[in-house]
Amino acid sequence: MFGSATANPPAQRDLPSSDSDSPTPDAQPPYLLEISHISKGFPGVIALNDVQLRVRPGSVLALMGENGAGKSTLMKIIAGIYQPDSGEIRLRGKPIRFETPLSALQAGIAMIHQELNLMPFMSIAENIWIGREQLNGLHMVDHREMHRCTTELLERLRIRLDPEDLVGNLSIAERQMVEIAKAVSYNSDVLIMDEPTSAITETEVAHLFSIINDLRAQGKGIIYITHKMNEVFEIADEVAVFRDGAYIGLQRAESMDGDSLITMMVGRELTQLFPEREKPPGEVLLSVSNLCLNGIFKDVSFDLRAGEILGIAGLMGSGRTNVAETLFGITPSDSGEVRFDGTTVHIADPHQAIELGFALLTEDRKLTGLFPCLSVMENMEMAVLANYAGNGFVQQKALRALCEDMCKKLRVKTPSLEQCIDTLSGGNQQKALLARWLMTNPRLLILDEPTRGIDVGAKAEIYRLISLLASEGMAVIMISSELPEVLGMSDRVMVMHEGEMMGILDRGEATQEKVMHLASGHKVH
């Protein structure tokens, strides 16, 4: 019965069988979870090589590493999705092996995936208790009891949602909370959170962290996977680092700083994360005057020079992405003027924008960028395919040569151009999408969250490419939610708040405090 899962903790769980004896009742193991000498290989790849990890009760362990470091593989082993080739897992001091994700859940290990696994046309209560529904005396689902238990669970977590709300009507952050509630409903002692803040606002992050603090106080062990170093130092007690399938080390978060963490992750010092550009910007290439999209943003005005990087900062919902989509013709403006290279232009659709020399790398590469079932080459050639086709034939040899050249220039790591792009790391996917647009020879490059969900080493590569393109005379608009990124890369920073342009700061005067002040709706005096 699921009712007891929320009100009173159940009796000691029956763990999957193990050949080893359990610890004595009086012995309290110091760790909730211990990983020892785990190895895992796939055809042609050693994903994990003799790694270790341990999670203390009542603590948050941040798991850091570049994409491909082995973090996800280890978490899938812990959650029962993969089986290790060798090594041992101990839960509460007892050796254990999970054959299925269900056996891991029943033992007290829950994983909240980055790609949320909820049913959009079912209610919150139905999603939380799916497969564990309470039945009444007629052996029918007892919706009243399910509602009661869900209400109690949400109140305990301070999540203000109606159990009867359809999940499909919730925001991403609210769905994240439902996933956490579902994990807690199993009385899980170990919770694995994979990039939980990748698509939520700062206010929602604060709420998430308060819930994590509550879970920590209840003695839960939390494994927190993230690429955001500021979150590590805010929420984590300890930090474990993986690199190239190997365990590098574990340290107290308070004993580390950003530089030492980066060095552990990439195996070298990134002395200059944001490259310097000596060449000054050229003449004005793009001039935007009083651009408006009814109900979304109004009176946006700015100039952009060739070779200049203009950062756009603001909180989620401020209108940053909408401005980019309007410039690219996805949502044509209702009023205002756009001049490109001295000529007034009316951009009605993306095809016209591309012909003018505009390129847009969208905010969500999985939703609006990638064709996940197609190859690297098929994804890269998408924007120029029409230029290499005629009379029913495609110039495959010329396209392949172009794609190979772009892969070399942008350092896209892939076994072959025929490789399914969905198998590449986030950083290499992003570079492949950037290559798609560079093949069109754009003069204006609009980047919306160009480093979202990629590791620090791949970020350095993206920054290098953006800086190189600007040095070659390309005008760049870069939208980002990461203030250090905006401040480190931009020549000027435009700040938006609820559809209004609050101001533009030169590089020398732009600080995190000033940008946040403007982004919150306050003018800088």
Curated annotation (Swiss-Prot):
Entry's PANTHER family?
CARBOHYDRATE TRANSPORT ATP-BINDING PROTEIN MG119-RELATED (PTHR43790), GALACTOSE_METHYL GALACTOSIDE IMPORT ATP-BINDING PROTEIN MGLA (PTHR43790:SF7)
One of the entry's Gene Ontology molecular-function terms is:
ATP binding
Its protein name is Putative ribose/galactose/methyl galactoside import ATP-binding protein
Q: Where in the cell is it found?
A: Cell inner membrane
Record organism: Pseudomonas savastanoi pv. phaseolicola (strain 1448A / Race 6)
Q: Which UniProt keywords apply?
A: ATP-binding, Cell inner membrane, Cell membrane, Membrane, Nucleotide-binding, Repeat, Sugar transport, Translocase, Transport
| The UniProt record lists the keyword Transport | yes
**InterPro entries xrefs:** AAA+_ATPase, ABC_carbohydrate_import_ATPase, ABC_transporter-like_ATP-bd, ABC_transporter-like_CS, P-loop_NTPase
The residues listed in the UniProt record as binding ATP, with positions renumbered to this chain, are G65, E66, N67, G68, A69, G70, K71, S72
Q: State if tRNA processing is listed as a keyword.
A: no
